[in-house]
UniProtKB/Swiss-Prot annotation:
It is found in: Cell inner membrane. One of its GO terms (molecular function) is succinate transmembrane transporter activity. It holds the Pfam family SDF. InterPro entries: C4_dicarb_transport, Na-dicarboxylate_symporter, Na-dicarboxylate_symporter_CS, Na:dicarbo_symporter_sf. It comes from Ralstonia nicotianae (strain ATCC BAA-1114 / GMI1000). One of its GO terms (biological process) is L-aspartate transmembrane transport. This is C4-dicarboxylate transport protein 3. The gene is dctA3. Gene3D superfamilies: Sodium:dicarboxylate symporter. Responsible for the transport of dicarboxylates such as succinate, fumarate, and malate from the periplasm across the membrane. It is a multi-pass membrane protein. Belongs to the dicarboxylate/amino acid:cation symporter (DAACS) (TC 2.A.23) family. PROSITE patterns: NA_DICARBOXYL_SYMP_1, NA_DICARBOXYL_SYMP_2. The chain crosses the membrane at residues 5-27, 42-64, 77-99, 146-165, 186-208, 223-245, 315-337, 352-374.
Amino acid sequence: MIRKTLGKLYVQVLIGVAAGIVQGVAAPNLGSDLKPLGDVFIKLIKMVFAPIIFATVTLGIARMENMKELGRVGVRALVYFEVLSTFALALGLIVVNLVQPGQGMNVDAAHLDTKAIASYTHAAARPQTFVDFLLSLVPSSIIDALARNDILQILVFATLFGIALSRMGTRARPVVDFLDVFTQGVFSIVGMIMRLAPIAAFGAMAFTVGKYGLGSIAALGKLMATMYLTCVLFVAIVLGGVARLAGFSLWKFLRYIRDEIFTVLGTSSSESVVPQLMRKLESAGVSKPVVGLVVPSGLTFNPDGQCIYYTMAAIFVAQATNTPLTLTDQLVVLGVLLLTSKGSAGVTGSGFITLAATLASLGKIPVAGMVLLLGIDRFMSEARAITNTIGNAVGTLAIARWVGAVDRERLQAALDGVPEAAQTPPQAVHVHAPVAHVEAAHPPLAH
């Protein structure tokens, strides 16, 4: 029994997290030197990140029977992302005003040392326009996009390539078959990499506690507690509501992806589980085209945890520096963040750059106040990353349910904990089929 429990990945990751905390407290200098353990794991995941997105998206689109549905899935996904991002920003705004974690700190922004955030404010001084964003979607070279792991550029090329293969018909069969085998091989590599997750969690947590210390948590514990509380509320209320509307149990789904959740807890990176999450969703009966389109784009357009953090951090700085903000001012903050929060996920330091750009554009909240966040930002990254991951997974499944791209029997079996080997063979779920038809007829799943 004990051996079986210890053999589960999420248990091993939890042990790694606990051991990392103990290491960071007992020997902080050694703990802060263990960062490479987590970095290597993240780099290994990023190594297969671009190939998986390219192959999965291309393969999924190439096998779609109705190209019109590709646009329908994309439009629904973008609308969903915008609505959920707004909910996340609004919830962060409401909770930070109710709890007021920065009230009473009475910080004079003029006396803060801003050297530590100079690189972020310098980057924020060159804001990206909407035209710049559109231009950045088109890769000058697909090799360059793959080398830089540029998610959006890879998605654009893979979508076009998939459409081209679909239009070629049987002539594209050799390429499609190759991509199928290639995808299976890369996912096999992912399985090997995931065995290192407990070691990565140990190193990442030992570094965090060893470098920043538990004292930084105590100093700004109210803000941290508020952040974690808000993320829990968002998952339980907002994502719970989405799951109910889509017709599946949120709690069963969270249990189904628990390995990925605990891996994110240890590594503080939502990117670290994207390949495994895509495989899990496909195993649960979600069609490959929907998984390939929604999961990668959700990283950029649907960072729910990041959105909660943005409004919370902005208002916290205002409270701590005694900067008065009217309701209109706060709604302006929300509106600006609704635009600036897009396209920043997955880039190191992007959260601080986005926040700095937002505060600078508003002109009311002192950018120097961001110094207050440096000490605990790393401790809040777990909450952001976990919420991002859960939000992306729930969103993908919900969108798939709404466009009729889920094999209901396989989904129910997965949520009930039936081993994949014991399930019935995959069946073809056509994206264009209405949900009622899929549930009633269960047409065969395209491979």
